Amino acid sequence: MGQDNINLNKVDGQPSSPPQEQQQQQQYPPQGYPQQQQYPPQQGYPPQQYPPQQGYPPQQYPPQQGYPQQQPPQQYPAPVGAPQQPYMATQQVVVQQVYVQPTFGVVPVDCICQHCQTRMSTKTSYKSGSMVWLVCVLLIIFGCWLGCCLIPFGIDSLKDVQHKCSHCKKVLYRFDRMSGK
């Protein structure tokens, strides 16, 4: 009957320590720091060192009993005559300008001429287009055939807009009022 007090928690034939002793060895982080979840190491493997969380200073843990303490990596001095300055990698930045051709409309625009490759502001002129002819035909249909049908030819807001280069005088674009393009 004296064997009733034997600890039945045996691992590899060796009695294990009671759970109360394991709880006393557990250390808590100082106040103000979140508690990191720690897992018990598996048998046969040394405990792993996890990197500290960003934003918090690294914590020093006392060495655990029964495991050899790891040595920090050995640092070697620089060879004699070698520069002692740290190596700074430089990154070359290539800037590529992308020029987006502006949308041609009713007003002059700043652009690069596709013919003479100069940067300039376009010269605009008004030309009779499909909108002028449509309004003229509609006026004739409604009975304004005695000269009133010619009024749309004098209204610039109904005419197409032609954009020309101010240097080489070549036509760059024609804005069509009917299609809006």
Curated annotation (Swiss-Prot):
Domain LITAF: 90-177
UniProt-listed GO biological process terms: response to bacterium
Region feature Disordered, mapped onto this chain: 1-82
One Pfam family here: zf-LITAF-like
Gene Ontology molecular function: zinc ion binding
UniProt topology in membrane: Peripheral membrane protein
Record's protein name: Cell death-inducing p53-target protein 1 homolog
